[in-house]
């Protein structure tokens, strides 16, 4: 049997169902390349699920390409788990393994975990149904990511917030920070609207070092944050309740809160 198990954004997010399954399997592949879980360590995992099994700290090459068939073959003979940061199939990274296992007639069980998609609206008080398409901002090494800006513009035109995931290149030990992202966004902003729009900086969301800051997007770079993972929410025109949450929950400065409490225009 093959388990796909969500780790959440902290090792403390593992559910009882997840821990029970991890205790029962013979081998655990720990996905180490799709996200950073700040408080995760193999020692902590072993203390929760026991050491009488094989642990593999899996880089990209372990879980993609030709190795998919190896993992599926293993799962045909014994119980295997792939432990994934966040929720296993919010992104499509491991879909090929699931499809191949099912094609071979191998049982697959998914145990869900907490994801930034649920935590971001919950922690900030922004309404989940007012989020548009999520997009990733990558480092502009070979090209400028104008498609990211176009997605943000499309969402704003429909009065929808944008959850902006920031580039992670874990195997290169490189992770984009909120200040870096702000500089890139303002450089790409041909409309000149993003600088003064409300942004929410999310650092280590869901961990004990979590930091959430709301301010003008341009001013998010002036705060100190714990190390990545970082994300940003580009806020469309907020509902009055959302505006209250941005102020009282996320620390939106008083002068911005008061301005948009009475203003009919945004930003």
UniProtKB/Swiss-Prot annotation:
Tell me yes or no: is Methyltransferase among this UniProt entry's keywords: yes
Which terms are listed as keywords in the entry? Methyltransferase, S-adenosyl-L-methionine, Transferase
Q: Which GO terms describe its biological process?
A: methylation; protein histidyl modification to diphthamide
Q: Which Gene3D superfamilies match?
A: Cobalt-precorrin-4 Transmethylase, Domain 1 (3.40.1010.10), Methyltransferase, Cobalt-precorrin-4 Transmethylase, Domain 2 (3.30.950.10)
What catalytic reaction does the record list? Answer: 2-[(3S)-amino-3-carboxypropyl]-L-histidyl-[translation elongation factor 2] + 3 S-adenosyl-L-methionine = diphthine-[translation elongation factor 2] + 3 S-adenosyl-L-homocysteine + 3 H(+)
Per the UniProt entry, the signal peptide is none
Specify the domain of life of the species encoding this protein. Answer: Archaea
- Involved pathway(s): Protein modification; peptidyl-diphthamide biosynthesis
Q: Per UniProt, what is one GO molecular function of this protein?
A: diphthine synthase activity
Which residues are listed for S-adenosyl-L-methionine binding in this entry? 9, 87, 90, 115-116, 166, 205, 230
One Pfam family recorded for the sequence: TP_methylase
The EC number of this protein is 2.1.1.98
Q: Which family does it belong to?
A: Belongs to the diphthine synthase family.
HAMAP family for this protein: Diphthine_synth
Q: What does this protein do?
A: S-adenosyl-L-methionine-dependent methyltransferase that catalyzes the trimethylation of the amino group of the modified target histidine residue in translation elongation factor 2 (EF-2), to form an intermediate called diphthine. The three successive methylation reactions represent the second step of diphthamide biosynthesis.
Subunit architecture: Homodimer.
Name recorded for this polypeptide: Diphthine synthase
Q: What organism does this protein naturally occur in?
A: Staphylothermus marinus (strain ATCC 43588 / DSM 3639 / JCM 9404 / F1)
Name of the coding gene: dphB
């Amino acid at each position: 049997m093959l388990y796909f198990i969500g780790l959440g954004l902290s090792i403390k997010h593992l559910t009882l169902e997840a821990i029970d399954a991890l205790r029962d399997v013979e081998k655990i592949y720990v996905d180490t390349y799709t996200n950073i879980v700040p408080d995760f360590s193999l020692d902590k995992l072993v203390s929760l699920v026991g050491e009488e099994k094989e642990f593999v700290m899996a880089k990209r090459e372990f879980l993609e390409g030709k190795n998919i068939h190896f993992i599926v073959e293993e799962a045909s003979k014994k119980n295997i788990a792939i432990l994934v940061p966040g929720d296993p199939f919010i992104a499509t990274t491991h879909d090929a393994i699931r499809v191949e296992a099912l094609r071979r007639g191998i049982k697959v069980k998914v145990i869900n975990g907490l994801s930034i998609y649920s935590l971001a609206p919950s922690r900030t008080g922004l309404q989940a149904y007012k989020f548009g398409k999520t997009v990733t901002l990558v480092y502009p090494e070979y090209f400028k990511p104008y498609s990211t800006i176009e997605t943000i513009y499309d969402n704003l035109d429909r009065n929808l917030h944008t959850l902006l995931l920031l580039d992670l290149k874990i195997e290169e030990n490189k992770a984009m920070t909120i200040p870096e992202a702000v500089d890139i966004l303002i450089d790409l902003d041909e409309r000149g609207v993003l600088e003064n729009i409300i942004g929410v900086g999310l650092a280590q969301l869901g961990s004990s070092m979590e930091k959430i800051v709301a301010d003008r997007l341009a001013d998010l770079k002036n705060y100190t944050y714990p190390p990545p993972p970082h994300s940003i929410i580009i806020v469309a025109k907020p509902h009055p309740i959302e505006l209250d949450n941005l102020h009282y929950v996320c620390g939106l400065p008083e002068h911005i809160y008061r301005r948009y409490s009475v203003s009919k225009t945004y930003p």
